[in-house]
């Protein structure tokens, strides 16, 4: 469950971990990353999201690009390279949750064998200020994209997707998914009944078909189940993702790699 440690103590814990962390990189490592920057720019524009890459060696963001439309773009941009500037943009009620999530992920990944550290995708939500100073709801994916010469995490990519322009109170949630197995880790005690999967196989099937544009009647015919059963699966997914509508639930499912 979410820790009861104060936000100020969490900040101290998190920044201590970052400042004491060491990795070994060379100019050649940076040259390889710079050659691939254009791919991140293209991905941001196509997927309408913002992408930031944090350098655990330099202790700062070395890349930022936003394809999110101007009105809802975050107040975080290329001029803000340091972590404390990112956290200054978060909703005060969400800062502790985000810090706790990052600390637990950091400890989890550094305890894994080097060959497994790039296999995980963290997905969590929060509220952040946009350019106009209003709070919007975002979902962030975080993953290690490059390791140093000793196999230790070096570059961490954060991808923010706009979930809603409304800053109403939201249910904070986080999921760590193994991209190879599809299994959930670390925050399983926060899932219903201690499950290792957020959705059942049937729920995945239903939402994959919804993502293709099929309505409940067509899905029922395709899966040989009743329309009532399809609608029940819809409601279960909305409940599990704590989302307000099918579109938001689809965003979650996509970012978790389920559809």
Features from the language model and the residues they span:
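The N-cap/first-turn positions of alpha helices
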Residues: 202-206, 216
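Regulatory hinge/linker segments at domain boundaries
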Residues: 179-202
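Per-ARNT-Sim (PAS) sensory domains and their PAS-associated C-terminal
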Residues: 113-143
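PAS-family sensory domain signal
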Residues: 28-85, 179-187
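PAS/GAF/H-NOX family sensory domains and closely associated sensor/linker modules
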Residues: 85-109
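PAS/PAS-like sensory domains
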Residues: 46-50, 103-124
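Recognition helix of helix-turn-helix DNA-binding domains
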Residues: 213-248
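Short loop/turn elements at sensory-signaling interfaces that couple input to output
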Residues: 141-156, 164-170
């Amino acid at each position: 469950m979410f820790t009861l440690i104060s936000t100020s103590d969490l900040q101290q814990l998190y920044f201590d971990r970052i400042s004491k962390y060491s990795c070994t990189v060379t100019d050649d490592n940076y040259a390889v990353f710079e050659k691939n920057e254009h791919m991140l720019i293209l991905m941001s524009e196509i997927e309408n999201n913002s992408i930031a890459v944090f350098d655990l060696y330099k202790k700062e963001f070395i890349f930022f690009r936003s394809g999110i439309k101007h009105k809802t773009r975050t107040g975080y941009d290329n001029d803000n390279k340091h972590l404390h500037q990112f956290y200054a943009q978060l909703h005060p009620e969400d800062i502790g949750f985000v810090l706790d999530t990052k600390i637990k992920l950091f400890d989890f990944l550094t305890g894994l064998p080097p060959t497994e550290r790039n296999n995980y995708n963290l997905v969590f939500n929060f509220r952040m200020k946009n350019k106009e100073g209003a709070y919007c709801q975002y979902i962030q994916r975080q993953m290690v994209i490059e390791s140093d010469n000793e196999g230790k995490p070096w570059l961490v990519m954060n991808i923010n997707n706009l979930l809603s322009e409304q800053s109403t109170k939201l249910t904070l949630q986080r999921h760590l998914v193994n991209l190879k197995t599809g299994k959930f880790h670390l925050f399983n005690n926060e899932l219903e009944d201690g499950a290792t999967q957020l959705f059942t196989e049937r729920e995945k099937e239903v939402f994959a078909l919804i993502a293709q544009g099929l309505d409940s009647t067509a899905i029922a015919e395709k899966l040989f189940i009743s329309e009532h059963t399809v609608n029940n699966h819809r409601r279960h997914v909305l409940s599990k993702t704590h989302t307000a509508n099918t579109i938001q639930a689809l965003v979650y499912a996509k970012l978790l790699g389920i559809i």
